[in-house]
């Protein structure tokens, strides 16, 4: 076996054995301690940390635009990485000596006993509920006032944009929407319970009966003949990557006869948006950029402040 890997594992075992038992048991929110070395283990937590004014001691790699999304690169310049969201490196986390770790039960429940021996863990139940992430992290990391202001500003922006959209669409309000993610070999439609779906719902957009009836956060469409399932007045659409195969799949889609019969294409309401913002960011900064995108593609004069 590789000697480097063996030494890293020995270091991890030794480091965990030297940590005080029960270090991760007390809830951070119940103490007056403000963590200074926070490690974030999912994208929405990293986004939220930056929004709260925290420069993490460590972050996981982004899903695309690696190693970190462009919109966060300046804020996170020089911040160490601790592996993938789906497989963070415990060895790297130990070496960074965090005093708090933000993780998600969805991704990291199996690792929680080990993580809690390294530092107190803030464990989020969901990775898609960005406002809950702000609330929990703000409370646990002693940034409650900042979190409250972020959420207040969010509500003001949503209320303002909703009013502008209602005026723009008039008697056609609320139009139904679908969010289409074009991938190499299939299309994924995001549902009301997803990260982008929750933002559109909060703005007052409608959903088709089929979308509302589906459980989960997305619907996988394996062939173009199933596209009518997600028919709507408006399509927000993005390409998963810049690869030629994704581009070919998109071009094949918009040339398909069924596509031409759908309401959004017929009404010229197919709007291309940023995939990182809409699908991968997962935090309140990304959600605010979604509002910017919506104001832009709908032609709201002056955007939304």
From Swiss-Prot:
CDD domains on file? FhuD
One annotated Gene Ontology cellular component of this protein: outer membrane-bounded periplasmic space
Which protein are we looking at?
Achromobactin-binding periplasmic protein
Keyword annotations from UniProtKB, A to Z: Ion transport, Iron, Iron transport, Periplasm, Signal, Transport
Q: Pfam families under this entry?
A: Peripla_BP_2
Endpoints of the signal sequence: 1-29
Superkingdom assignment: Bacteria
Choose any GO biological process term that the UniProt entry carries and state it.
achromobactin transport
């Amino acid at each position: 076996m590789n000697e480097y890997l063996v030494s890293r594992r020995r270091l991890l075992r030794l480091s965990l054995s030297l940590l005080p038992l029960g270090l991760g048991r007390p809830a951070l929110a119940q103490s007056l301690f403000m963590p200074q070395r926070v490690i974030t283990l999912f994208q929405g937590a990293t986004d939220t940390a930056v929004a709260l004014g925290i420069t993490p001691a460590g972050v996981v790699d982004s899903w695309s635009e690696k190693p970190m999304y462009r919109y966060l690169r300046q804020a996170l310049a020089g911040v160490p990485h601790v592996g993938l969201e789906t497989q963070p490196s415990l060895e790297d986390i130990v070496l960074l000596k965090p005093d708090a770790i933000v993780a998600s039960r969805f991704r990291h429940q199996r690792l929680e006993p080990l993580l809690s021996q390294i530092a107190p863990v803030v464990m989020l139940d969901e990775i898609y509920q960005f406002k809950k992430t702000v609330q929990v992290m703000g409370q646990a990391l002693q940034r409650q006032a900042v979190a409250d202001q972020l959420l207040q500003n969010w509500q003001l922006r949503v209320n303002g944009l909703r009013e502008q959209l209602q005026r723009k669409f008039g008697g056609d309000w609320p139009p139904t929407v679908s969010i289409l993610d074009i991938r190499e070999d299939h299309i994924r439609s995001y549902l009301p319970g997803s990260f982008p779906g929750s933002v559109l719902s909060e703005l007052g957009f409608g959903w088709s009966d089929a979308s509302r009836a589906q459980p989960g956060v997305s619907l996988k469409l394996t062939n173009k003949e199933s596209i009518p399932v997600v028919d709507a007045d408006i399509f927000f659409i993005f390409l998963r990557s810049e690869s030629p195969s994704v581009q070919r799949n998109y071009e094949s889609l918009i040339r398909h006869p069924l596509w031409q019969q759908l309401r959004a294409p017929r009404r010229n309401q197919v709007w291309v948006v940023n995939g990182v913002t809409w699908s991968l960011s997962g935090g309140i900064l990304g959600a605010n950029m979604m509002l910017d995108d919506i104001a832009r593609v709908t032609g709201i004069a002056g955007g939304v402040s």
